Regions:
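Short hydrophobic beta-strand elements that form part
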Residues: 7-8
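Short, well-formed alpha-helical segments that are part of the catalytic scaffolds
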Residues: 13-28
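Acidic donor-binding segment of Leloir-type glycosyltransferases
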Residues: 24-70
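Short glycine/serine/threonine-enriched helix-capping/active-site loop
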Residues: 38, 72, 128-132
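A short, glycine-/small-residue-rich helix N-cap motif at loop->alpha-helix starts
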Residues: 74-81
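Active-site nucleotide-sugar/metal-binding loop of Leloir-type enzymes
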Residues: 83-95
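Short beta-strand-to-loop acidic/aromatic patch adjacent to the donor-nucleotide binding site
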Residues: 93-104
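Conserved donor NDP-sugar-binding/catalytic core segment of glycosyltransferases
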Residues: 108-134
Length: 134
């Protein structure tokens, strides 16, 4: 399967980041997927240690085909980081699975998302696919 890249946005929550990485890596398609992580820079000195620890956890992650970590040298804020990251990956790959650091996914999440992206890739009325319904 030609899997969609996974795009994860993180900031200063190392415990959350560890949980999302562990959940993602338990997915069968993780080993076939490239993970792109965009880590925003600390907004203040008070956030610096948590940002550094979050980045350390990402560098130690395993279970993916490749892990690409973008460490922002300056804080872009949530919107700036997401807009730039999504735009970059969409322009490179044409599709993406987007996550933030507080989303712990189910074991078949990557299969579901990749199957749905493939099923609807030529459907002009489908703009996005999401995995959460309230």
């Amino acid at each position: 399967m030609n899997t969609a890249p996974i795009l994860l946005f993180v900031y200063n929550r190392p415990a959350h980041t560890r949980r999302v990485l562990e959940a993602l890596s338990r997915n069968a398609l993780a080993a076939e997927s490239d993970l792109f992580v965009y880590s925003d820079a600390a907004r203040s000195e008070a956030d610096r240690a948590a940002v550094t620890e979050t980045r350390r956890i990402i560098r130690q992650a395993r279970g993916f085909r490749q892990i690409h970590l973008t460490e922002r040298p300056q804080n872009l804020g949530l919107a700036g980081n997401i807009i730039d990251g999504v735009t970059t990956i969409i322009n490179q790959y044409g599709r993406v699975i987007v996550l933030e650091d507080d989303l712990v996914v189910a074991p078949h999440f990557l299969q579901f998302m990749n199957d749905a992206l493939e099923a609807f890739k030529d459907e002009p009325q489908v703009g996005h696919i999401h995995a959460c319904e309230f």
